[in-house]
Amino acid sequence: MDQNINNVPAIEQVSINKIFGIPAGAQEILIAGRTAPAPYTPAIDPYYKFEMGHLRDVIAWLKVGMGEGLFLTGPTGAGKSSLVLQVAARLNLEVFNVTAHERLEFSDLVGQFVVKNGNMEYQYGPLALAMKRGGVFLLDEIDALPPGTNVGLNGAAEGRVLVIPENGGEVIKPHPEFRFAATGNTRGSGDDTGRYSGTIKQNLAFLDRFWCLEVGYLSKQKEEAILESVLPVPEMKGLIPKFLEVAEEVRRLFQSSDFTTQINTTISTRSLIRWVRLTHVFLSMAKRGCQPVYYALDRAILNKAAPEEKAAVKEIVQRIFGISEPEK
C-alpha cells in the first residue's frame, strides 16, 4: 500500500443531488467528497443500481461523523460491500478493504515492521492508512473476527486516537472524514443455520458502537434494469423475467427457516449477471444439442454446489423455463 499521505487530494463539499441523480426540486444536500478519484478510490460500476433507502442511510452515516460505525448485515450475495464501495466510488472517497478471518490480528490492520532495501521500515496497515488519509475502513466478514482483534478495534470504531507502541509510540489522530464500516451475515450473533461456518459470536460492547443496516437482495425491478443494461440484445429480453424468477425462488429457499426445504446455494446479483451473460455466449451451442441455460448455469453458479443442491436448483429452472437439461 502507498504509505505517502501527502498525495491525498483535498476533500471538499460536493452535492449528492448531482452525483446520485436526485430529482430537481429536492433540497440540495452537501457532503464530504472529491471531484476526482484518489489513489484508493474504488472503481465505479456503471451498472450498479442503488436502493434509495440504503443510499439514504449510508449518506446519513457519512454525514454524522466519526464515532459511529456502520454494520451492514444480510445474506450472502446481497451486495453489502458493494453498497459502501459504490457510494464511496461516486463521492471519490478512498476505501481500505479487508476481509476478516480467524487468524487476523490487530497488527495486520495497524501495521508492522518490514524489510525494505535492507532496512527495517514501519509499514502502515489499512486501518492506520484510513485514519491518516480520511478514508473508509471497510472490514468484511466481521463475523469471523477473533474476539481479541475486535476488542482492539473498539477505539477505532469510536474515532479515538490510535497509539502504535511498536513505532515509537506514534499517535494517529483520525482524519475528520475517517469512517469505519463492517459487513457480516449473522448480525454478529453467531450462526445457528449451518450456512456460515467459521463465524464467531461478536462482543456486544463492540457491536454497540455501530449503526446496523439490513441489506437484502435488490428488487426484481432493479435487477431487471441491470440485466437489460448489461446485455441489451433482443434474443435475451424475453428470457430475463425467467432468470429473475429463478433467482427469487432460489433466494427464498436459501433464506428459509424450514430445514426440509432450505438449500445452501444462493444467487447474488453478480452471479445472476454472470449466468445471463454466459447463456448468451453459449446460445450458438444449442444447435449442437447443448442447452445454453443449463450449461451456463453450471459454470456460473452450480459447479461450486453439492450434487443435491444442483438438482434442487435445476428443478426450479426446469419448472420456470419449461425446458429440460439434455442427458450427458
Predicted region positions:
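C-terminal regulatory/interaction module of P-loop NTP-utilizing enzymes
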Residues: 1-328
